[in-house]
């Protein structure tokens, strides 16, 4: 199963995160399938590759809680069909 989750980058006390599509059995810093976004909590900047995110969501990828909040804030779920916005 594939998940959309955060991968920590940056230096100590200055974390930035990549939003990646990754197999659930991989560790947090493991090899990802594709980088689909970027999130900097300090500067509150977000970059999302929306077509890639929609592709993985349509294929059944599940976003983690934090990634789901980021996607809701960016209104990515409005581009999906209404019956596909339910996640476990």
UniProtKB/Swiss-Prot annotation:
GO terms of biological process kind: translation
Repeat keyword on record: no
Cited InterPro entries: Ribosomal_bS16, Ribosomal_bS16_CS, Ribosomal_bS16_dom_sf
A matching Pfam family: Ribosomal_S16
Taxonomy, superkingdom: Eukaryota
Coiled coil segments of this chain: none
Family statement drawn from the similarity comment of this UniProt entry: Belongs to the bacterial ribosomal protein bS16 family.
Keywords: Chloroplast, Plastid, Ribonucleoprotein, Ribosomal protein
Location(s) in or outside the cell: Plastid, Chloroplast
Keyword Methyltransferase: no
Stated name of the protein: Small ribosomal subunit protein bS16c
GO cellular component: chloroplast; ribonucleoprotein complex; ribosome
Source organism phylogeny: Eukaryota, Viridiplantae, Streptophyta, Embryophyta, Tracheophyta
One GO MF term: structural constituent of ribosome
């Amino acid at each position: 199963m594939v998940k959309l989750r955060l991968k920590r980058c940056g230096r100590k006390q200055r974390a930035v995160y990549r939003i990646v599509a990754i197999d659930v059995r991989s560790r947090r810093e493991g090899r990802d399938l594709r980088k689909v976004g970027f999130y900097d909590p300090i500067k509150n900047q977000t970059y999302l590759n929306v077509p890639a995110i929609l592709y993985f969501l349509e294929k059944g990828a599940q976003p983690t809680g934090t990634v789901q909040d980021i996607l809701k804030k960016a209104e990515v779920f409005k581009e999906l069909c209404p019956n596909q916005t339910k996640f476990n």
